[in-house]
Amino acid sequence: MEIKYRPEELTKLPRSVEYREGKVYMINQRLLPREFKVEEFTTVEAVAEAIKNMTVRGAPAIGAAAAFGLALYAETSKAKTKDEFFDGFYRAYETLKNTRPTAVNLFWALNRIKKLVEEHREDSLDEIKRLIVEEAQKIADEDVEANLRMGHYGAEVLPEGNILTHCNAGSLATVHLGTVGAVVRVMHKEGTLKLLWLDETRPVLQGARLSAWEYSYDGLNVKLIADNAAAFVMQQGKVDAIIVGADRIVANGDFANKIGTYMLAVLAKEHGIPFFTVAPLSSIDMSLSSGKEIPIEERSPEEVLTCGGCRIAPDVPVYNPAFDVTPHKYLTGIITDRGVVWPPFKRNLKKLFETL
């Protein structure tokens, strides 16, 4: 597969997560679209809180943010001995690990650095610190390259026409470009994307606040709809394919993504519309056999009871799962950075990982 475009040809946005000179920099996604602000983080605790409160969100983005949190610890640690350094490292690791439970990239990135540290325990302290920072940067850079490949793979298999997406799996949800974001940007560049339908994505409105902002910023033709309008738009024949991100894909092809994804998958099947998820290999968890095993985060009732800081409902009990699980039977294909995986997913995902 030929890479035709570089990131700077596809988006004007900067990276959503960066690390420079002992500081983590992240676009504050809670402020968008009212204000674009890159904030600076100087402690592991501050990075962890940013992941928890969704200043940074999106599975690949929080994976990179967590990795940079460990880099930040390494560069700012005042430990005099290796034992002292390792004690602090494992505390930082646990602090970051305990932020959000569903997105597997978080654990993948943290465990990758932890494994590296344990393999180099006998090296000098300075060398261990250097390796941590270098590995965190590699994780971020690899994410951008993976997105670029997914963008090209996805553009090859999606039909020309109108695409519907849910939540935000764009540049803001990754280090740069996005998963879905890379696909629709390559399609836009090649003239095959006619219209990008955006679900508003209640209760936090990532589709309305973030996707609408970033895709219109890059000049894509977008149209925003209420979540409960999706079925009618499909019924009218105005959707040619649906593409969504994934926070965790398991061995049989079931996947967790933003709440409301499962609903779209069922509707797509009813209306005969191709339904794809797109995610890097770091989002695939082969240790789980089915989606029933994925831990689902529940968030504050306030996200449902309020909108933009204004109360919109009486003080009643709320059930607020942040994600749902889509069974693999609804999937047309899984677009990864190593190509498109087609059914049967259990066999073909296993085969994909055996070739790595």
Curated annotation (Swiss-Prot):
Q: What is its EC number?
A: 5.3.1.23
Which GO MF terms does the UniProt record name? S-methyl-5-thioribose-1-phosphate isomerase activity
SUPFAM superfamilies, alphabetized: NagB/RpiA/CoA transferase-like
Which residues are the active-site ones? D247
Isomerase listed as a keyword: yes
Binding positions for substrate per the UniProt entry: R57, G58, A59, R100, Q206, N257, K258
Q: Which UniProt keywords apply?
A: Amino-acid biosynthesis, Isomerase, Methionine biosynthesis
The reactions it catalyses are: 5-(methylsulfanyl)-alpha-D-ribose 1-phosphate = 5-(methylsulfanyl)-D-ribulose 1-phosphate
Q: Which NCBIfam families match?
A: eIF-2B_rel, PRK05720.1, salvage_mtnA
- In Swiss-Prot or TrEMBL terms, this protein is called Putative methylthioribose-1-phosphate isomerase
Organism lineage? Archaea, Methanobacteriati, Methanobacteriota, Thermococci, Thermococcales
